[in-house]
């Protein structure tokens, strides 16, 4: 494997604050794991639309994608056809922008865990993304 540190990113407070204002979400500078706290599976379509039409800054895109994936994790167990269609859009973005979203893909894939009873609800879906992009990160 290549040195993967170069692809490691973390959400930026500045982006969290900006996105909170844009999306009407709670934000406080003392919050850790903002994307987990404010996730909302009912708003995935809105989040994806903002991602696709309004964002140019990589920090903002990374931070919003973290919120989107966390929101999928909240709702994927009771997914209907609409949510699965939204997942296909998200999956396409993750694959296309895999270098930007490497940290999100790696975290939610939970690759070291083999027992599917001990993974996130979204893990099996994200592992499909990982399987499609991992060659980009191998020697």
Each predicted region: which residue ranges?
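Alpha-helical solenoid scaffolds in large eukaryotic transport, assembly, and signaling factors
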Residues: 2-3, 7, 14-96, 104-113
């Amino acid at each position: 494997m290549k040195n993967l540190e170069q692809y490691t990113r973390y959400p930026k407070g500045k982006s969290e604050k900006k996105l909170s204002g844009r999306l009407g979400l709670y934000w406080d500078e003392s919050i850790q794991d903002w994307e987990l706290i404010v996730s909302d599976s009912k708003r995935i379509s809105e989040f994806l639309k903002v991602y696709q039409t309004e964002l140019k800054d990589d920090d903002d895109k990374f931070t919003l994608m973290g919120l989107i994936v966390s929101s999928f994790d909240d709702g994927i167990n009771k997914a209907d056809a609409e949510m699965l269609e939204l997942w296909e859009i998200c999956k396409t973005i993750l694959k296309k922008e895999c270098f930007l979203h490497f940290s999100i893909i790696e975290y939610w894939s939970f690759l070291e865990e083999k027992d599917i009873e001990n993974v996130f609800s979204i893990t099996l879906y994200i592992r499909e993304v990982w399987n499609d992009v991992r060659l980009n990160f191998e020697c």
